[in-house]
Amino acid sequence: MEQRSNQFWNIPNVLTLIRLLLIPVVVLLAVKGQMTWGGITFILVCMTDLLDGYIARKYGMITKVGIWLDPVADKLMAISVIITFTAMGVVPLWVTITLFVKDGLLLLGGALALKNGNSTPSDLFGKISAFLLNTSIAAGFFREYLGQSYLYIMYVALGLVILAFIRYAILNWKLIFTKASGEKEE
Protein backbone atom coordinates (compact mmCIF):
# COMPACT_ATOMS: atom_id res chain seq x y z
CA MET A 1 0.00 0.00 0.00
CA GLU A 2 1.34 3.42 -0.91
CA GLN A 3 2.06 5.85 1.86
CA ARG A 4 0.64 9.37 1.60
CA SER A 5 1.82 12.39 3.51
CA ASN A 6 0.55 15.88 4.18
CA GLN A 7 3.90 17.37 3.13
CA PHE A 8 3.64 19.86 0.28
CA TRP A 9 7.17 20.85 -0.70
CA ASN A 10 8.75 17.91 -2.48
CA ILE A 11 10.13 17.36 -5.97
CA PRO A 12 6.94 15.93 -7.54
CA ASN A 13 4.77 18.78 -6.22
CA VAL A 14 7.30 21.39 -7.35
CA LEU A 15 7.27 19.84 -10.84
CA THR A 16 3.47 20.04 -10.80
CA LEU A 17 3.64 23.72 -9.80
CA ILE A 18 6.09 24.34 -12.65
CA ARG A 19 3.56 22.74 -15.02
CA LEU A 20 0.87 25.10 -13.73
CA LEU A 21 3.16 28.11 -14.17
CA LEU A 22 4.00 27.08 -17.74
CA ILE A 23 0.34 27.00 -18.87
CA PRO A 24 0.27 30.73 -19.74
CA VAL A 25 3.67 30.41 -21.43
CA VAL A 26 2.43 27.61 -23.72
CA VAL A 27 -0.80 29.51 -24.49
CA LEU A 28 1.08 32.76 -25.18
CA LEU A 29 3.52 31.01 -27.52
CA ALA A 30 0.57 29.59 -29.47
CA VAL A 31 -1.25 32.93 -29.63
CA LYS A 32 1.92 34.68 -30.79
CA GLY A 33 2.31 32.12 -33.58
CA GLN A 34 5.39 30.52 -32.04
CA MET A 35 3.93 27.06 -32.60
CA THR A 36 7.20 25.13 -32.69
CA TRP A 37 8.35 26.64 -29.39
CA GLY A 38 4.88 26.19 -27.95
CA GLY A 39 4.92 22.54 -29.01
CA ILE A 40 8.36 21.94 -27.55
CA THR A 41 7.32 23.59 -24.28
CA PHE A 42 4.10 21.57 -24.21
CA ILE A 43 6.03 18.31 -24.73
CA LEU A 44 8.49 19.25 -21.96
CA VAL A 45 5.55 20.00 -19.65
CA CYS A 46 4.06 16.58 -20.46
CA MET A 47 7.41 14.96 -19.70
CA THR A 48 7.48 16.62 -16.25
CA ASP A 49 4.10 15.01 -15.61
CA LEU A 50 5.59 11.57 -16.24
CA LEU A 51 8.65 12.45 -14.18
CA ASP A 52 6.76 13.71 -11.13
CA GLY A 53 4.59 10.59 -11.03
CA TYR A 54 7.63 8.34 -11.32
CA ILE A 55 9.53 10.18 -8.58
CA ALA A 56 6.50 10.25 -6.27
CA ARG A 57 5.96 6.49 -6.57
CA LYS A 58 9.62 5.41 -6.60
CA TYR A 59 10.71 7.51 -3.63
CA GLY A 60 7.52 7.47 -1.58
CA MET A 61 6.78 11.15 -2.14
CA ILE A 62 3.06 10.72 -2.76
CA THR A 63 1.16 13.47 -0.99
CA LYS A 64 -2.52 14.19 -0.56
CA VAL A 65 -2.01 17.56 -2.27
CA GLY A 66 -0.11 15.94 -5.14
CA ILE A 67 -2.84 13.36 -5.70
CA TRP A 68 -5.28 16.23 -6.16
CA LEU A 69 -3.01 18.83 -7.82
CA ASP A 70 -1.40 16.61 -10.47
CA PRO A 71 -4.58 15.80 -12.43
CA VAL A 72 -5.79 19.40 -12.02
CA ALA A 73 -2.56 20.65 -13.62
CA ASP A 74 -2.96 18.12 -16.45
CA LYS A 75 -6.56 19.13 -17.13
CA LEU A 76 -5.83 22.86 -16.95
CA MET A 77 -2.98 22.52 -19.44
CA ALA A 78 -4.98 20.41 -21.89
CA ILE A 79 -8.14 22.54 -21.66
CA SER A 80 -6.20 25.82 -21.89
CA VAL A 81 -4.44 24.73 -25.06
CA ILE A 82 -7.62 23.22 -26.57
CA ILE A 83 -9.54 26.47 -25.93
CA THR A 84 -6.67 28.46 -27.44
CA PHE A 85 -6.54 26.16 -30.46
CA THR A 86 -10.31 26.47 -30.89
CA ALA A 87 -10.08 30.28 -30.80
CA MET A 88 -7.27 30.09 -33.38
CA GLY A 89 -9.27 27.76 -35.64
CA VAL A 90 -6.86 24.86 -35.11
CA VAL A 91 -9.40 22.62 -33.32
CA PRO A 92 -13.13 22.44 -34.16
CA LEU A 93 -15.49 23.80 -31.49
CA TRP A 94 -17.34 20.48 -31.18
CA VAL A 95 -14.12 18.80 -30.01
CA THR A 96 -13.73 21.38 -27.25
CA ILE A 97 -17.38 21.06 -26.20
CA THR A 98 -17.08 17.25 -26.11
CA LEU A 99 -13.99 17.45 -23.88
CA PHE A 100 -15.67 20.01 -21.59
CA VAL A 101 -18.76 17.83 -21.16
CA LYS A 102 -16.63 14.76 -20.48
CA ASP A 103 -14.45 16.58 -17.94
CA GLY A 104 -17.50 18.16 -16.29
CA LEU A 105 -19.13 14.74 -15.88
CA LEU A 106 -15.87 13.28 -14.52
CA LEU A 107 -15.63 16.12 -12.01
CA LEU A 108 -19.25 15.64 -10.96
CA GLY A 109 -18.80 11.86 -10.61
CA GLY A 110 -15.63 12.32 -8.59
CA ALA A 111 -17.32 14.86 -6.31
CA LEU A 112 -20.31 12.55 -5.75
CA ALA A 113 -18.01 9.62 -5.00
CA LEU A 114 -16.02 11.75 -2.57
CA LYS A 115 -19.24 12.92 -0.89
CA ASN A 116 -20.10 9.25 -0.38
CA GLY A 117 -16.68 8.53 1.11
CA ASN A 118 -15.30 6.83 -2.01
CA SER A 119 -12.60 7.67 -4.52
CA THR A 120 -12.58 6.86 -8.23
CA PRO A 121 -9.03 5.97 -9.23
CA SER A 122 -7.80 6.32 -12.78
CA ASP A 123 -6.74 3.24 -14.67
CA LEU A 124 -4.33 2.33 -17.44
CA PHE A 125 -6.94 2.81 -20.20
CA GLY A 126 -7.66 6.34 -18.95
CA LYS A 127 -3.95 7.12 -18.77
CA ILE A 128 -3.40 5.84 -22.32
CA SER A 129 -6.27 7.95 -23.65
CA ALA A 130 -4.90 11.03 -21.82
CA PHE A 131 -1.47 10.35 -23.33
CA LEU A 132 -3.00 10.14 -26.81
CA LEU A 133 -4.96 13.35 -26.23
CA ASN A 134 -1.74 15.12 -25.23
CA THR A 135 -0.04 13.62 -28.29
CA SER A 136 -2.80 15.06 -30.48
CA ILE A 137 -2.45 18.46 -28.79
CA ALA A 138 1.30 18.35 -29.45
CA ALA A 139 0.52 17.44 -33.07
CA GLY A 140 -1.65 20.57 -33.27
CA PHE A 141 1.41 22.67 -32.49
CA PHE A 142 3.21 21.03 -35.41
CA ARG A 143 0.33 21.16 -37.90
CA GLU A 144 2.50 23.24 -40.24
CA TYR A 145 4.60 20.11 -40.76
CA LEU A 146 1.83 17.52 -40.40
CA GLY A 147 -0.86 19.11 -42.56
CA GLN A 148 -4.42 18.02 -41.77
CA SER A 149 -3.23 14.68 -40.38
CA TYR A 150 -2.99 16.30 -36.93
CA LEU A 151 -6.82 16.39 -36.94
CA TYR A 152 -7.02 12.64 -37.57
CA ILE A 153 -4.70 12.10 -34.62
CA MET A 154 -7.01 14.29 -32.52
CA TYR A 155 -10.16 12.45 -33.66
CA VAL A 156 -8.65 9.06 -32.80
CA ALA A 157 -7.53 10.40 -29.41
CA LEU A 158 -10.97 11.91 -28.79
CA GLY A 159 -12.62 8.58 -29.61
CA LEU A 160 -10.37 6.80 -27.12
CA VAL A 161 -10.99 9.51 -24.50
CA ILE A 162 -14.75 8.96 -24.89
CA LEU A 163 -14.35 5.17 -24.65
CA ALA A 164 -12.18 5.59 -21.54
CA PHE A 165 -14.84 7.86 -20.02
CA ILE A 166 -17.62 5.34 -20.70
CA ARG A 167 -15.50 2.53 -19.23
CA TYR A 168 -14.64 4.69 -16.20
CA ALA A 169 -18.32 5.54 -15.64
CA ILE A 170 -19.38 1.87 -15.85
CA LEU A 171 -16.59 0.66 -13.55
CA ASN A 172 -17.14 3.42 -10.98
CA TRP A 173 -20.95 3.67 -11.06
CA LYS A 174 -21.34 2.04 -7.63
CA LEU A 175 -18.57 4.16 -6.10
CA ILE A 176 -20.24 7.31 -7.37
CA PHE A 177 -23.74 6.55 -6.11
CA THR A 178 -23.26 4.42 -2.97
CA LYS A 179 -21.99 5.22 0.48
CA ALA A 180 -18.64 3.77 1.44
CA SER A 181 -18.87 0.78 3.75
CA GLY A 182 -19.14 1.87 7.35
CA GLU A 183 -20.71 5.23 6.45
CA LYS A 184 -24.14 6.03 7.82
CA GLU A 185 -26.97 7.02 5.50
CA GLU A 186 -28.26 10.52 6.20
Where do the language-model regions lie?
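Alpha-helical transmembrane bundles and membrane-interface segments of multipass inner-membrane proteins
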Residues: 1-186
